[in-house]
Structure formats: C-alpha cells, structure tokens
Amino acid sequence: MDQELPDGLREEIKKIALQHPEVLNLHELRTRSSGRQIFIQLHLEMDGELKLREAHQIANEVEIEICREFPNAEVIIHEDMEGLHGDESRE
C-alpha cells in the first residue's frame, strides 16, 4: 500500500533542496512510497528574474542531489518565482 514518507525523510528532502544557493524556498512537497519505489514532487521558489533555462538547470541540479540520497526516487520539480505562494512555503 502506498504511504507518505516519514517526517525525517521529508525533512531530509527539504534540506537537500534548500542547500542549493539559488533555491530561496520550497512548497507543496508531496511524497509517497510504493514498495521500494519513492515518488517525490515539490515546487522550488527562485528569483523571478532568472531565465527559464537557469531555473530549469537549478531544478535539475536539485533533482540530481535528491536522487543521490534517494536512488529509488522518481522526482518531479516545478519551478516557481519566490513569494508566489505566500504562507504555503516550506511545506
């Protein structure tokens, strides 16, 4: 049966994402595990002045770092401008 990842693993994912110097915040972190497979979705907040190519590269770098720590993960990252989601941030 699918289930949400434990809080400790979710915190580790947040920590990895927020270590990138261009990531200002994150929100809408969704995780689940199905057997040995892990599914991770999150929105990264970055400077709205970044070019799309730059934002995409940052998301790719974060995805690589998450997959290093969670090799059985399928990761989907959405790029957002900082502040677009107000109080939803960091969750």
Can you describe what each PLM-predicted range is?
Residues 1-91:
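Alpha-helical transmembrane segments and adjacent TM-loop junctions that form the membrane-embedded core
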